[in-house]
UniProtKB/Swiss-Prot annotation:
GO biological process assignments: translation
MF terms (GO), sorted A to Z: structural constituent of ribosome
Domain of life the protein comes from: Eukaryota
Name the UniProt record assigns to this protein: Small ribosomal subunit protein uS15c
Family, similarity comment: Belongs to the universal ribosomal protein uS15 family.
Major site of localization recorded for this protein: plastid
GO cellular component assignments: chloroplast; ribonucleoprotein complex; ribosome
Pfam entry (one): Ribosomal_S15
Source organism: Lactuca sativa (Garden lettuce)
Subunit structure: Part of the 30S ribosomal subunit.
Location in or out of the cell: Plastid, Chloroplast
Gene: rps15
Length: 92
């Protein structure tokens, strides 16, 4: 529950800036919220295959956005993954 409340605080901070709704950080935060909600849903409903597919699609979108942010601004990327408590993407 601590993670979810922390995510909500970050989300509210991002939401205060109405101009930044299209920013990469805001999109990653909103995808992370959706991922956490779907993950808790799938713990109860293991055979909900449509939700599993939706989760994989959202994970891919977030991964692509994080890769973009990593290339464009490494400092903002590091700060964001630190705030959201998510792992850094693997490099080849």
């Amino acid at each position: 529950m601590v993670k979810n409340s922390f995510i909500s605080i970050i989300f509210q901070e991002q939401e205060e800036n109405k101009e930044n709704r299209g920013s990469v950080e805001f999109q990653v935060v909103s995808f992370t919220n959706k991922i956490r909600k779907l993950t808790s849903h799938l713990e109860l409903h293991k055979k909900d295959y449509l939700s599993q597919r939706g989760l994989r699609k959202i994970l891919g979108k977030r991964q692509r956005l994080l890769a973009y942010l990593s290339k464009k601004n490494r400092a903002r990327y590091k700060e964001l993954i630190g705030q959201l408590n998510i792992r850094e993407r693997k490099t080849r």
